[in-house]
Swiss-Prot record:
Enzyme nomenclature, EC number: 3.1.-.-
Top EC class for this record: hydrolase
Protein name: Toxin YoeB
Keywords on record: Endonuclease, Hydrolase, Nuclease, RNA-binding, Toxin-antitoxin system
Biological role: Toxic component of a type II toxin-antitoxin (TA) system. Has RNase activity and preferentially cleaves at the 3'-end of purine ribonucleotides.
Organism: Streptomyces coelicolor (strain ATCC BAA-471 / A3(2) / M145)
């Protein structure tokens, strides 16, 4: 599965890489788990509704969520900070 980031998703990832290595490790673990199975695993995966239908989220911590969109051959990371 190919992993790509939106510009906003990459900006969030870089923010964590520069400010908090622990959160960056958690995000990397979530991404690896999503690549194995986008719909089950760590971080309480849940499908989003409404305008974000087709997207999924997983918990990075109590405040922040990793929002992503899985397709057949690609995983798009949309957001890695804040709550959707």
């Amino acid at each position: 599965m190919r992993i790509t980031f939106t510009s906003h998703g990459w900006e969030d990832y870089v923010h964590w890489a520069e400010s908090d290595r622990k959160v960056t490790k958690r995000i990397n673990r979530l991404i690896a788990d999503i690549a194995r199975d986008p719909f089950k695993g760590v971080g309480k995966p849940e499908p989003l509704k409404g305008d974000l239908s087709g997207y999924w989220s997983r918990r990075i911590d109590d405040t922040h969520r990793l929002v992503y969109k899985p397709t057949d051959d690609q995983l798009v990371i949309v957001q890695a900070r804040y709550h959707y």
